[in-house]
């Protein structure tokens, strides 16, 4: 497949192709402009893949610009986290990192230009009065009594704002557009407000800060952005984007294009709701593996490649829709099935004793690291007469559909011997504590010599060599597809979104590193936890199961 055939197509790429063909642009320059007031989530990953992916495919540039115009909510911690997430996803920004605060001097100058043109004024209505005067979708707004101040008075008052002469909330700079506009965003929007807060880049130089809609378009123009890509909620804001650029002296006028945001089943993306999950301790932090944050997905074991593939599959449209969680899970499942080495771990262990195996002895069994990739090599796994198997892999009685170990019948131990269940021991409550078996010594990784068929295969871990491991069985955070539609979204949290088990793993897992996934054979995909795992305590997170159990449950 050629590069052109492999490249995804969508309405934005069609616009870019037309712009390049017509000569409107000779190159492509995009940007990813997050506000550093929180952690990125899977929805941001879509925007990252779109903006950086377009720049890559068209041999253009993509800037990373922090929209840092509200010092009260922003922090350098979020700046560092966002940079890390972008790089982890496999992208690199063009040149230095940009900050909207880099342009505060120019933005101030453009605000003064609008005042001089009679297109901006200092308003002393309170924030509550501004909201009241703005009107509604069905009723026009009304002019502020301060709207018709002279240019000279507005210049003096704006300078008073800049030098700290007003208290917060006592004055702001507004654009003079049309209070009767059918678009509320055009009803004299606020351009500057007062905030006496130290900024993580500019310190205490400024006490007035520009609003997003004023900053965004000018920053795009100053950076030479050719295609400014936003989600659909900014569609009406495009009118203000164009109005600002049309009314200041700036040589470049980028165009804004909107695409649908990512909505994903069984989770929430609202920053307010995610923050509530964290602050009320329904999860263990922003990087909790149940969270839709990039840091949470990474800790759970998602790969950057799987997230990029997911963003590619869902595409870019103008239609709002909700993506099935199964689609995201399918991407990581396919990635790890192809690339994750195999290992054996027993999550719900019960002891199995092979009574005719030489007592006190052990041997090494060779196992492939991947059944379909010999180039991934093999490993030596110890085998002995006492092993752990999963409790679900044994029944005293079962029908023919049960292909595991049954009393009086045989099963194969993965890459080892055929065994037969002979008897069990139970505790006072009737729970099986030990399964006693015999083995066929002539069946190591081969069929029985007499031709009898043994269909079932189960995994195991040698008891004498087993590593105690904690296994965190993560699942979907919510029990319904659209938790945001619930009257109280916290009431539909899945009570089994985290189940912690104490099990055993094969010795090779001692070399596991955070972020490197394994397929625990017959169980699912797991990775070492980056927070709780230590040299003395191995903790593994379930990334995803071998199959979609939610689809079966919903049938």
Curated annotation (Swiss-Prot):
Motif 'KMSKS' region location, chain numbering: 268-272
GO cellular component, one term: cytosol
Keywords attached to this entry: Aminoacyl-tRNA synthetase, ATP-binding, Cytoplasm, Ligase, Nucleotide-binding, Protein biosynthesis
Annotated catalysed reactions: tRNA(Gln) + L-glutamine + ATP = L-glutaminyl-tRNA(Gln) + AMP + diphosphate
Residues that bind L-glutamine: 67, 212
Motif position, 'HIGH' region: 34-44
Cell compartment(s), UniProt: Cytoplasm
GO biological process, one term: glutamyl-tRNA aminoacylation
Top-rank taxon, per record: Bacteria
Signal peptide start-end: none
Subunit-structure text: Monomer.
Name by which UniProt lists this protein: Glutamine--tRNA ligase
Organism annotation: Salmonella schwarzengrund (strain CVM19633)
